[in-house]
Each structure stands twice: as structure tokens, then as C-alpha cells.
Amino acid sequence: MSDLSAHTPMMQQYWKLKNQHPDQLMFYRMGDFYEIFYEDAKKAAKLLDITLTARGQSAGQSIPMCGIPFHSLEGYLAKLVKLGESVVICEQIGDPATSKGPVERQVVRIITPGTVSDEALLDERRDNLIAALLGDERLFGLAVLDITSGNFSVQEIKGWENLLAELERINPVELLIPDDWPRDLPAEKRPGARRRAPWDFDRDSARKALCQQFATKDLKGFGCDKLTLAIGAAGCLLTYAKETQRTALPHLRSLRHERLDDTVILDGASRRNLELDINLAGGRDNTLQSVIDRCQTAMASRLLTRWLNRPLRDLKVLQARQDSIRCLLDGYRFEKLQPQLKEIGDIERILARIGLRNARPRDLARLRDALGALPELQNAMAELEAPHLARLAAITGTYPELASLLERAIIDNPPAVIRDGGVLKAGYDNELDDLLAISENAGQFLIDLEAREKARTGLANLKVGYNRVHGYFIELPTKQAEQAPGDYIRRQTLKGAERFITPELKAFEDKALSAKSRALAREKMLYDALLETLISHLAPLQDSAAALAELDVLSNLAERALNLDLNCPRFVDEPCLRIDQGRHPVVEQVLTTPFVANDLGLDNSTRMLIITGPNMGGKSTYMRQTALIVLMAHIGSFVPAASCELSLVDRIFTRIGSSDDLAGGRSTFMVEMSETANILHNATDRSLVLMDEVGRGTSTFDGLSLAWAAAERLAQLRAYTLFATHYFELTVLPESEPLVANVHLNATEHNERIVFLHHVLPGPASQSYGLAVAQLAGVPSPVIQRAREHLGRLETSSLPHEQAVSKKTKGEPQAPHQSDLFASLPHPAIEKLGKLDLDDMTPRQAIEMLYQLKNLL
């Protein structure tokens, strides 16, 4: 709104502020409420389910309005942030008693989903990330910031496919993109995508701002000096963070250069299919993290989630973690550490709030307790001989001076906010103690003064009192007023009484009337000074928090290794993946019966397993457990297997199950083929590929053809491949592809009921047991019986299975006798011959047809 002259002074003030934030809800402080006006009010009333009303008129129109009590702000903010909304907080900074016109107000902070830091607005076990993008279809610069921890990273990524996979991994709640980008690009379809002015991404300005933030001459020390696109994106994030926080950001101390080549890459589909930290229903139960996360602190849980979503290919780091877990298992040392780590709490986010200068009293109390627990924890860490654990111990340190300061300053159980005082201990500051004593002991002072004055004057009817209009006074009946001492100054005449004040009472009044407000102001000033002291130690404290989080994760993995019977995998140079008695870490915990462990062997002689067997036989579980074992090995964890020997992999692909993409206009089969295409384009001889039922979403012939060709291609790529299928024709692949072998999940039938044995055995399955599974699922008996009739007719009418290549050698497992779908297709020449009407043909036509038929052979 540009013309404000027709509005009231208060609404003019409102619109001047609102016009600076047109796309965000504005909470406008008025007394004890935050008021919300105009379109913001209509939107907020609907989102928050609060009453929409009207407040007078301005510019000739009534003002739509709703409001919330100031002390209930956090609950409403949490709801709005969860809905993806951003909120501008506008506070009164002027004094209503001295203001002429509207009380002065200003925006003090902006709450957005990606920049919240308040504990009540965050999921303590999840990173809250904001990202920014710059680039074109060939190369992108990506910057990622977690304002609640200070983690700040950049990378450059080639192509949309890799970029979208990385966005799926980090899952930012906000994504900033330049406003001059074309509309409807893939990145903009993500929830939380917001456009920013192109100059926010200016690379020169970004470089200058980042160097200023980190107090460096250039960015070479961070290894990202030449990543100009990523630097532009990082500059945008820094600007956005400062704009929303309205304060310096001392907890942002460095920039980390991440490289895709350092990690095992998982695309979005693979991440979802493996249910690492989110299950297929969108929840957290029965995920890998739900099984292996018993961390004592929330900051360690977040670190473990990052490890799971970014497995490493750095052998040195992985072996250091393995050595650390062994050390912690030795003598069950983790059992001593874990209770001590629990005392540390989530100091990572506490320190971030201190850096943002919005830490609350209970944050400081928790930091006090954490620092107090450090010496005992350090003593325990000193006994850990593993080199990596020794490095973590050296980083952690102790902070006796800060611990002592917080112990002297903060009461044992402080209130939630500093607003009403009562946070600092008695004895911390003499002036504050005096002010509080005046305020708290005013009643006793008046009683004592009255007793002293009665004794001094001999006037038994003398009273000391107070009212809001005239303040403190000494009251005497009119008859005794003439006997008042000379230092009594007349203040008020009443019917039947006179009121006086003395220099002593006046001095007390001046102190008492302002003591409470002065005490609050003094306590707030001391609290802010305490925050500044902590900020000056922020760098080593943050390093300690990071080290303690990693120690917690490693202790957790040691505990899980013991209680889940996990063993240390061995990385080797020879390309291989050998698993002895492997188990699915999640399914094993859910089952009420013992899990059937299975072996797997892939190396230079066998790169692909064709897996056949009945539905529910365990094919998908076998494939998923393989991927999870490989992934756990690549975070440095022990794995659910008796033994495991593997080489480093570069990517993990899964094509397991599909659902349609209605919003994107893609059918189930289209989604399946898109995932398959991604695998065939990007898999290498270092990739692990899981393919489950490829081709089932289309006609039988098309599906089999695609599955066969995809399997051949993967065999030629030499990728480590597990290929589950119900197309038994594929079991002849080992005859033409020497790197392919057959295995099957066994089952048996007893009294016409199927029994799944879940053992993986060499060779192809003998039958699919499809009707038995259908019966087990509760398909009506008449339907099952009719299906048996159809099956019998189909089996007798199809041509016998023909071998695709030369006969197998004696003793080798045989492919099941099943009709060859390709063999059962009529030859075009036979099909055409069957349609001829020989009686209507002339000799010449017959000769021409013979030539045509010959050409078809």
C-alpha cells in the first residue's frame, strides 16, 4: 500500500512496516497482545483456528483483525512454522507513558521454517536446514546452512539428476532460488522453495560478506575459493540469516566444502525404499535409525542421521570409526560413558542460541550442568587408547571458569524466560541484590519505620501507608498533626487527618517505586553480559559439542554392536561383496520368530544374482538387508552378519516397488521405467544395484523383454546386482552371461498350504507358488479353484520351454520347466499363412505369396 495519508497514525505505522514484508504474516505488538490485521488476519485466523473480528476503521474501511496473547506466542508460532509459514515479530520499543502518538515499534526478528532456533519450534532429533541454489542445467552451486548448529557447507553439482538426489538427501525446509530463474523448474517444486532477488546471489558481494563473517582474507582455507556458484549461494544464505535474525551470527565460523565423490550416492528412490530414517508411510517406526539409534543426546541422534544419509567412501575415516567402536566394546567401556554423555544434553543447539543472543535461562542452566559434568567425562575419555577417541578427548577439554561463572549466576531451576526476572542468584551482583531487597522488603521496612516513628514522636495513632496517587506517607489524626516533628513535610490534607512525608521516607519511596523496574532492567543487562561472556568462548565450546556428539554416536554404535550381535566388516581392495549369515537389522527386531540368516557372494567371477522364488518368500528382504549391510559398513558401523568382506562402493541403487506420480502425470510403470533408466545410465562396476520385479507394470511380453535387456545391460556393466524376478525365462541368463548366477528362496507345500523357509539356495526356483500365496492371502476358494483350471489349460496349450543356448552341463542346477513366452508367439509367416483363403487364390497370387512367406523366414 503506497498512499497512507488516509489511514490513522497507528495504521500508517503498521503499513510502513508491513510493506517491507508483504509475503509474511506480521504479528504487531499492542500491549499484552500480538494483533494481526487485514489479509494477514484472515489467513492467520484460518490457519490457527482463532476468531476473526474487526477493529474500528481506517481509510474509511473496517480493519479485519485477530490476536493472540503475548505469553502464548510460542505455541502459535510452532503451528505456523510447521505449516511452512513465515512470521514477522514487531515489538513495542518505545515507552507508552512518554510517547506522543503511536508507541514506537520495530521488527525484532523474522521466524521462517529454515531459520527458527527456539527449542519449542524444532524437532530435537532432526536437522533444520535451509539451502540456496545458483547455476544452470549443467552446473549448480548448492549452499546448506543449519542455523541451529552453525554447520555451513557448499558444493557444486553437475546436472539436475545429481542435484535433485542431493536435495532429497539434505531435505531442506527452505530452498532459496534466484528470482530470474525460469518458472516451474524441478527444484521449485520442492516444499519451501522461495525466490530471492538476483543481487542476493551476487558472487563478489557474497565472497566479501563470507570473508567478513569468518574474519579471513579469502576462502582458500576452506577449499572452496574457486566454487563461484556455491559461493554466490552461500552469500544469499548469509544475507537471509542476518535479515531474519537481526543480529550478528558469531556461531557461523567456517565453511565446509562437500564433494559427492567422497560419499556413497543414493538417489531419492533408493533412500525411500531402504527406509533409513523415514518409513514408506512417512513415519519413523521400523526404520534403520529406529533400530540403531540409542544415542544419549539429541545432537548425537542428528549426527547419526547425517551419517546414515551420507555414507562415506573415505577408508581412513571408516577404519578410525571401526577402531573406536572396538575400543569402546573392550571391557564394555561404553557403559561407563553413556550415562555421563546423557548429562551433556543438546549443547550444540544451546550454543547456537547463545550465538544468536536468544538463549533462555534454562539453556544456560543446562549448559552449566553440562560443563559441570565434563571433568568426570574427561577422566573416562582419558582411558580410551584408540587414536580417534584420543583426538575427540583433546578437542573436548573442560571449562572450569565458565562452569563456575554459571554456577554463581543461574539459580538451580530458573524460569522459562528472562522477561519477569528471578533468574540470577542472590550474591551474583550487589546492586541487583539491593534493588530486589527494596522491592521484596518494602512491607517490612514500613512496619519498622512506623514502630520507630511512634517511639520517636510518642504519637500512638501514627500510621505509615501507601497509595498509587500520592505514594508513601505518614498519617496523623488532625488533633495530633500539630505535634508532628519538624522534619515532617505536609503532603495531603484529609477530613480528620493529615499526611506527611520525611526525607527518609522520600528516599525510600524513590528507591522502592523504581526498584522493581530497575531490578528487571539490571537483571536483563547482567544476563546479556553473561551471554556476551559465553559468546567470547563460543569457538572452543562448539568444537567440544561436535566432539561429544561424535563420541556419543560411536558409544551408541558400540552398544548396538553388542546388543544386536553386529560384527566388524572388513574392507578389501579386491572388488567383492561377501556376507556370511547376513540379517535384516530392522525385520529381525520386528519378528517374533528367529530370523533366517543368509549368505551372499559377489566378486569378479559373479557380479549378478538372478533371484527367484514365491511372493512373501523373502526376496525383497534379502536384497534390502544386503543394501543396509553395505550402507552400515560405509558409516563405520558394525553390521548384522557373522562376517562381511567388501570393497568400497560408489552408489547404491534400488528399484523396489513403485507407486504412481499423479501430480507429475506419471503412471506406476512410467515411474518404474524412470528409476530403471537412472540406474542403467549411472551404475558402474563399483555400484550396488537392487532390481525387484522389473517390467511387471506392463504387458507380459513387453515386461519380460525389458527385464531381460536390463539384466543383460547390468551384467555387462559388471555392477554388483541382485535381480529378483518372476520371469523364469531370465534364469537362462547364466548360460549367456558368465558373471550371472541363479539363487532362489525356497518354500514347500504341506496339505495344500505354502510354508516359506526363507533360505537362499543355489539355482532357480522350481515353481512360483502364486496360487498358494493367493490362498494364504484369503482369496475365495472358488476363485482359487477356477485359477487352477485356467493354469492347467495355459500350461498344456503353451509350447514347451526351449533352451536359449547350448545344453547345460550335467550336475548344474536346471532352470524350471516353464513355458517360454517368446517361444509361444506364432511366427509371422505361420500367422499369415493361417489367414489365407487358398480357394480364392490364382496360381500367380499363390506364387507371389510364397515369395512373401519366404522373405518372412
UniProtKB/Swiss-Prot annotation:
Gene Ontology cellular component terms for the protein in this record: cytosol
Q: Which GO terms describe its molecular function?
A: ATP binding; ATP-dependent DNA damage sensor activity; damaged DNA binding; mismatched DNA binding
| SMART domains recorded | MUTSac, MUTSd
Query: Has the keyword NAD been applied to this entry?
Result: no
Chain intervals for the UniProt region annotation (Disordered): 795-823
InterPro entries with a match to the protein in the record:
DNA_mismatch_repair_MutS, DNA_mismatch_repair_MutS-lik_N, DNA_mismatch_repair_MutS/MSH, DNA_mismatch_repair_MutS_C, DNA_mismatch_repair_MutS_clamp, DNA_mismatch_repair_MutS_core, DNA_mismatch_repair_MutS_N, DNA_mismatch_repair_MutS_sf
Per the record, the GO terms for biological process are: mismatch repair
A Pfam family matched in the record: MutS_I
Q: Report residues binding ATP.
A: 613-620
Q: Does the keyword Nucleotide-binding apply?
A: yes
UniProt keywords (A-Z) are: ATP-binding, DNA damage, DNA repair, DNA-binding, Nucleotide-binding
- Which top-level group of life is the source organism from? Bacteria
Q: Which family does it belong to?
A: Belongs to the DNA mismatch repair MutS family.
Q: What is this protein called?
A: DNA mismatch repair protein MutS
Q: Which organism is it from?
A: Pseudomonas putida (strain W619)
